[in-house]
Each structure stands twice: as C-alpha cells, then as structure tokens.
Amino acid sequence: MKQPHIQLDESLNVRYAILPGDPKRAERIASHMSEVEDLGMNREYRSLVGAYRGARILAMSTGMGGVSTGIAVEELHNIGVTHAIRIGSCGALQTDIAPGELLIAAGAVRDDGTSRAYVREGYP
C-alpha cells in the first residue's frame, strides 16, 4: 500500500535507507550510486533509489525534526525497510572537534515530544 507521506510502497523492494534532512543531500547521496531512479518528492520527502556495492539503497530526505523523521521511519518500516541510517550536520561545543570531522552520536539531549513515544525517559 502506498504510504500517505512518503508516497512509496512495497514494490520498491528496498531494505536499506540513508536519511538526510535536506532534499539536496539525498541527491548528493544518490550521486554515489549506480542505476539511480528518481522516485520524486512529496512534502519534505525527496526519494531516490540506486545500487551501491551490490545493495539496493534508498536515499530519502526527512526534513528537520523528530516528527517528520518519525513519520518517515514508520512509513519506511511499513514498506519493508529494515535498516536506516540518519545522517546530517550539527554544531559542536568542544574546541577539539574540527569542522567536517565525522561524529557518531551515542546519545542526545532529548527535549521533544516525538522521542518519548519511542524510548523511555532517561535513555541517551
């Protein structure tokens, strides 16, 4: 069934997704893939699918914030995506972190409503 926000369905047959916030970043991700198919854009959700090292991968923007990302992840789950990586940019307070340095977050300050629906209070 076509999902109401991302406008994709199970026929896409993809298990892996890379999720930037910005639609232009979805295009940039797709530029590293072969056999790219532009699936279009609905609201903040820019979707392109392609192949990378033998895997079929969806690059789809989520917009900013937890609510739009939550919608994206739930609808992707509904169409069979089992692995998703959210990527993006951030600021740093530590002076030893250089611009452009790769960071992998182990936790986050949560002061929103969306994450409370998924994990208990106090979880990183």
Model-found features: residue ranges?
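Metabolite-binding pocket within alpha/beta catalytic cores that recognizes anionic/polar moieties
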Residues: 1-124
